[in-house]
Amino acid sequence: MNQLDLIKSSIKSIPDYPKAGIIFRDITSLLEVPEAFKATVDAIVAEFKDKGITKVVGTESRGFIFGAPVALALGVPFVLVRKPKKLPRAVISQSYALEYGEDTLEIHLDSVKENDNVLMVDDLLATGGTIDATAKLIRRLGGKVEHAAFVIWLPDLGGKERLEKEGINSFTLVEFAGH
């Protein structure tokens, strides 16, 4: 079995969770297979090791799981983007639209510097709303955002196209049809 097949086969699909009509892609099952988790991190690192990345940013919370080991392997700092009131130092905030309502993300003011070449990492690319808000935070701090990496891509939801319009190239490992 090749590495991408190992990764994909390690992700369990849960129908009708969290609501009817949704198929939830559960990365916790991937984390329970050390070879698949390592293959995931290794594939992202291989893609970005020669792109001059100076920071890796992970978005709460599953972006932390994959982003931190990627940053460690690349030898660069790892930066957290979190929900409001979770970061202790001075922050900036960015709101973004959800299917029904709005949410907000925050980043420490001193986490990204002018001209940092930032790789954003998250577990899943669906509509792209969360990672687009993350990119806006990074850019407001002067960072350069041209790359994002995801374990899972749901192509039917338009996230990759949304990010392309913002000048962000998406690297994805496996894709699943549907929601």
From Swiss-Prot:
Look up the record and report any one GO term of the cellular component aspect. cytosol
- PROSITE patterns from the xrefs? PUR_PYR_PR_TRANSFER
- Please provide an example of a Pfam family that matches this protein in its UniProt record: Pribosyltran
Q: In which pathway does it act?
A: Purine metabolism; AMP biosynthesis via salvage pathway; AMP from adenine: step 1/1
Q: Which reaction does it catalyse?
A: AMP + diphosphate = 5-phospho-alpha-D-ribose 1-diphosphate + adenine
**Entry function:** Catalyzes a salvage reaction resulting in the formation of AMP, that is energically less costly than de novo synthesis.
Relate the assembly described in the record: Homodimer.
Name the chain's protein.
Answer: Adenine phosphoribosyltransferase
Its source organism is Actinobacillus pleuropneumoniae serotype 5b (strain L20)
Give the classification, highest ranks: Bacteria, Pseudomonadati, Pseudomonadota, Gammaproteobacteria, Pasteurellales
